[in-house]
């Protein structure tokens, strides 16, 4: 089976170009199995604001206490995931919404105590995911369940998407409101792994882009052939990436 992981950022979800679903339908008609992973940062922030809770980030990652976790879980599973599945189904693209708990899709562990209820994936149930791909487009939110302590955890959606791509040895398209990796305000078309650390050290890659590229580096070192970071608001962006039309930034082991 040939998979493509497509990570849709929270910013793109509110302004997702309708061609994304059509492009995904086209992939399936060509026996390519797309797997959607989504975040929901803006929606989580809005839900927290409604409860007078201020979001807090460390090194680009959301700090998640118990109250924040409860709101995050409800927002991602009941609101964002459900709405996205409905959107796909309305376009005659049969989709199924999933979190880590469903079909024991993936297992997690706590990331770091300072981040609270933030987890990282440790194993992926490839058999279950492969079977679901033959019937539906899986739409996976970034909520996981820890079988050891019986708690739900928030996972950085990029981290989860990269982990799935590495586990399946599949390419990943990371779609957000960012056109690619910017160096001196210019999108670079290709970023080899060897250049990532120096760009971070020099401050050219900073903020929320740091975990994105480090997770991409880790994914490629563990089996993912390439990572493409591109804008999800452009028409037919998935088709353009698939056809190697040089959109966004392609992160790869070395320059071709």
Curated annotation (Swiss-Prot):
Keyword check for Cytoplasm: yes
GO (cellular component) term, any one: cytoplasm
Glycosyltransferase is among the record's keywords: no
Sites marked Transition state stabilizer: 7, 212
Pathway terms, separated by semicolons: Amino-acid biosynthesis; L-arginine biosynthesis; N(2)-acetyl-L-ornithine from L-glutamate: step 2/4
Residues that, per the record, bind substrate: 40-41, 62, 154
Cellular compartment(s): Cytoplasm
Protein EC: 2.7.2.8
Pfam name, any one: AA_kinase
Function: Catalyzes the ATP-dependent phosphorylation of N-acetyl-L-glutamate.
Protein name: Acetylglutamate kinase
Organism: Staphylococcus aureus (strain bovine RF122 / ET3-1)
Upper lineage: Bacteria, Bacillati, Bacillota, Bacilli, Bacillales
Gene name per UniProt: argB
